[in-house]
């Protein structure tokens, strides 16, 4: 399944989530990650996120079983999602 994760956390905690998410996903922009994962990998990632979560953290995980179920448009100087490794 395709996964998009975005986070909004205090600056001192961004390193925690960036490191955690880069293990499985492509780092698209500052707090945006994208990739193709199995259901088991998504569950493991969510468990890791939950173990690091503090009350001031906000993380959203979008999951798409059908890659054609959503569309995207990229503006400016940005790589297409899925076009590079992290």
From Swiss-Prot:
Miscellaneous section: There are 3 CRISPR RNA loci in this organism and a single cas gene locus. A CRISPR-Cas type I-B system.
Disruption phenotype: Loss of the 8 Cas genes in this locus (cas1, cas2, cas3, cas4, cas5, cas6, cas7 and cas8b) leads to loss of CRISPR interference against plasmid targeted by this CRISPR locus, i.e. plasmid is not destroyed by CRISPR.
Molecular function terms, GO-annotated: metal ion binding; RNA endonuclease activity
Sorted UniProt keywords: Antiviral defense, Endonuclease, Hydrolase, Magnesium, Metal-binding, Nuclease, Plasmid
Gene expressing this chain: cas2
Complex and partners: Homodimer, forms a heterotetramer with a Cas1 homodimer.
Pfam families registered for this protein in UniProt: CRISPR_Cas2 (PF09827)
UniProt cofactor(s): Mg(2+)
UniProt EC number: 3.1.-.-
General function of this protein: CRISPR (clustered regularly interspaced short palindromic repeat), is an adaptive immune system that provides protection against mobile genetic elements (viruses, transposable elements and conjugative plasmids). CRISPR clusters contain sequences complementary to antecedent mobile elements and target invading nucleic acids. CRISPR clusters are transcribed and processed into CRISPR RNA (crRNA). Functions as a ssRNA-specific endoribonuclease. Involved in the integration of spacer DNA into the CRISPR cassette. Plasmid targeted by CRISPR locus P1 transform wild-type cells very poorly.
List of residues binding Mg(2+): 8
EC supergroup of this enzyme: hydrolase
Keyword Transferase annotated: no
Record's keyword annotation contains Hydrolase: yes
Gene Ontology BP term (one): maintenance of CRISPR repeat elements
Protein's name according to its UniProt entry: CRISPR-associated endoribonuclease Cas2
Family: Belongs to the CRISPR-associated endoribonuclease Cas2 protein family.
Organism encoding this protein: Haloferax volcanii (strain ATCC 29605 / DSM 3757 / JCM 8879 / NBRC 14742 / NCIMB 2012 / VKM B-1768 / DS2)
InterPro entries cross-referenced by the UniProt entry: CRISPR_associated_Cas2 (IPR021127), Virulence_VapD/CRISPR_Cas2 (IPR019199)
């Amino acid at each position: 399944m395709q996964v998009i994760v975005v986070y909004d956390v205090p600056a001192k905690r961004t390193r925690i989530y960036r490191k955690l998410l880069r293990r499985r996903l492509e780092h698209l922009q500052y707090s945006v990650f994208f990739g193709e994962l199995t259901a088991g990998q998504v569950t493991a990632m969510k468990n890791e996120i939950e173990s690091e979560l503090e009350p001031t953290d906000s993380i959203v995980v979008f999951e798409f079983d059908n890659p054609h179920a959503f569309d995207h448009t990229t503006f400016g100087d940005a790589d297409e999602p899925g076009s590079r490794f992290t």
